[in-house]
């Protein structure tokens, strides 16, 4: 728990003024609650027994005042703690995504997307509960316990000893329950992440599932995951919910003893009826915040586990360390010197590129040839520094690639692949992605990509909204938008990875002509199985099983 608050202390410090309000309002709630129980004594002794009419006129207002203070304090406490919780969660979520976006591609290849989504949504939700609800309730209930204990001791120190003995007796079984809950909470969150990963996989591949008649297979797999989640959840509840009944039972024993001993004290005249009922009311009310605190500590175990899962990401350093040199000049040369690249597969390294030595230069059009899996895309990934070579070195303009900042490197490179990224936004926003919108330039790039004609026929032209993944476009239209985006970036290195595979012959010829026009002062890399596209190349590079066979 100490580590938990240490991790979030920098966020909590930003809200110290709000915490002062929370502390003050919680104190008002505690005092109002204690005062309310104390008022039982004058109600019975002064009004019902002594028939004091003056007190009869005053006491109802005092009761209203007590509950007004309690209600107002609870509202202020709830509002400010939720404000703190929401703000901290917002900042942690921002920090998590920032951290994730710095990770190397190998991290994303090894981690299920649903697992990451679960951490950035579900796990953070548990942190919010701990930093807002649990924190405020702990302060409020803790102060309430102090106030009620004060009333209990004030009314009868002797009976207080009997009534409060329950606290240390309950500590041993409660601590064992809490340790068990923490262990189950970890399994529960991991199971929840598996469900999220399964759903993410299904929704991302729903078309393939339908085509392959895989609905029943996927449903069966999901039912299995869901059943496991249910069983762990029930087990968690079965353990966590023991604490409240246990406190109720032990509390009932203490109250029974107090009634017996206190009744004798009243009969002997050692304590007034009002004082005894004030005591018993405070004692009854005391067990409620104790039970709530016990439940909070139990529920807090989930937040501790969630915090560990969140900080696994926040404290993880990217495997690819960014360089310090900003690439200001145009890219003139890209050189590979004895480069090897291995991917981890089933805890074993498998080389996808072996002993690659070659050089690309400005004003060249390079054709990367080879069968699927020969290493063409892996070569491109190394140029973009999405992966680090296992052995060997890569140079950009005779500078080691690892010395160059990733941002400045990627600003000089545009890539168009078969997997086109279209997000929910206007055509203009998709083409100018990450850059300022210049309508004239956007239309020029759309024209070169043979996309302007169909865009202008859309309801709002370049301001027309595209659906997520571009589902309101054909495959060829999506590819042309991607080509226009690459052209808009005006990069010195253009990489086309099967970028014209979804285009008809006429459109493909027009796009190829645009590529030829871009050759001047640029380096263009073509990955294609289409012989007519490969004819554009001035240099051919062939890969077989990760090795160069033609250069």
Where are these regions (language model features)?
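An intracellular "coupling" helix at the cytosolic face of ABC transporter transmembrane type-1 domains
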Residues: 105-106, 122-131, 135, 139, ...
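Juxtamembrane helix-loop junctions of ABC transporter transmembrane domains
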Residues: 1, 24-25, 29-41, 45, ...
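Conserved catalytic Walker-motif region of ABC-type ATPase nucleotide-binding domains
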Residues: 100, 222, 310, 336-338
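ABC-type nucleotide-binding domain
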Residues: 330-551
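Helix-loop-helix
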Residues: 49-55, 61, 151-165, 235, ...
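Membrane-integrated ABC transporters
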Residues: 1-33, 48-62, 77-81, 85, ...
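Pre-NBD coupling/linker segments of ABC/ABC-like ATPases
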Residues: 317-329
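Transmembrane helices of ABC transporter permease
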Residues: 14, 18-29, 61-69, 133-187, ...
């Amino acid at each position: 728990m100490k580590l938990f608050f240490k991790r979030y202390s920098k966020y909590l410090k930003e809200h110290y003024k709000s915490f002062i309000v929370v502390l003050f309002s919680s104190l008002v709630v505690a005092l109002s609650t204690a005062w309310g129980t104390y008022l039982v004594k004058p109600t019975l002794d002064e009004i019902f027994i002594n028939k004091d009419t003056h007190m009869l006129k005053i006491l109802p207002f005092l009761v209203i005042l007590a509950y007004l203070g309690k209600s107002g304090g609870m509202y202020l406490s709830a509002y400010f703690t939720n404000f703190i919780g929401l703000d901290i969660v917002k900042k942690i979520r921002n920090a998590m995504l920032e951290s994730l976006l710095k990770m190397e591609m190998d991290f994303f290849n090894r981690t299920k997307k649903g697992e990451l989504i679960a951490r950035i949504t579900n796990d953070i939700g548990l942190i919010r509960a701990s930093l807002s609800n649990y924190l405020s309730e702990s302060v409020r209930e803790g102060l309430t316990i102090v106030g009620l204990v004060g009333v209990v001791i004030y009314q009868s120190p002797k009976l207080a000893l009997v009534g409060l003995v329950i606290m240390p007796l309950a500590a041993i079984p409660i601590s064992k329950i809490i340790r068990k809950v923490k262990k189950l909470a970890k399994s529960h969150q991991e199971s929840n992440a598996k469900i999220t990963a399964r759903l993410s996989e299904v929704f991302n591949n729903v078309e393939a599932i339908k085509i392959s008649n895989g609905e029943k297979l996927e449903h069966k797999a999901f039912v299995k995951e869901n059943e496991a989640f249910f069983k762990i959840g029930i087990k968690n509840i079965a353990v966590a919910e023991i604490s409240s009944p246990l406190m109720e039972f032990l509390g009932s024993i203490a109250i029974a003893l107090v009634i017996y001993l206190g009744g004798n004290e009243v009969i002997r005249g050692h304590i007034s009826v009002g004082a005894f009922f004030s005591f018993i009311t405070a004692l009854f009310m005391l067990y409620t915040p104790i039970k709530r605190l016990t439940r909070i500590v139990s529920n807090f175990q989930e937040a501790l586990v969630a915090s560990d899962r969140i900080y696994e990401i926040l404290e993880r350093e990217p495997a690819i360390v960014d360089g310090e040199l900003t690439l200001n000049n145009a890219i003139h040369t890209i050189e590979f010197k004895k480069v090897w690249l291995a991917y981890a597969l089933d805890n074993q390294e498998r080389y996808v590129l072996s002993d690659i030595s070659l050089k690309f230069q400005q004003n060249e059009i390079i054709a990367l040839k080879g069968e699927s899996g020969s290493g063409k895309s892996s070569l491109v990934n190394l140029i973009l520094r999405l992966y680090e070579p296992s052995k060997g070195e890569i140079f950009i303009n005779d500078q080691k690639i690892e010395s160059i900042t990733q941002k400045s490197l990627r600003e000089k490179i545009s890539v168009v692949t078969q997997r086109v990224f279209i997000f929910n936004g206007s055509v203009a926003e998709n083409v100018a992605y990450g850059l300022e919108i210049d309508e004239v330039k956007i239309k020029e790039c759309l024209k070169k990509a043979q996309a302007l004609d169909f865009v202008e026929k859309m309801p709002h032209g370049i301001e027309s909204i595209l659906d997520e993944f571009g589902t309101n476009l054909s495959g060829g239209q999506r590819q042309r938008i991607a080509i226009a985006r690459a052209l808009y970036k005006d990069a010195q290195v253009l990489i086309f990875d099967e970028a014209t595979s979804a285009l008809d012959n006429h459109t493909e010829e027009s796009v190829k002509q645009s590529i030829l026009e871009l050759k001047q002062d640029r380096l263009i890399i073509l990955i294609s199985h289409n012989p007519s596209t490969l004819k554009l190349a001035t240099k051919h590079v062939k890969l077989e099983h990760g090795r160069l066979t033609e250069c």
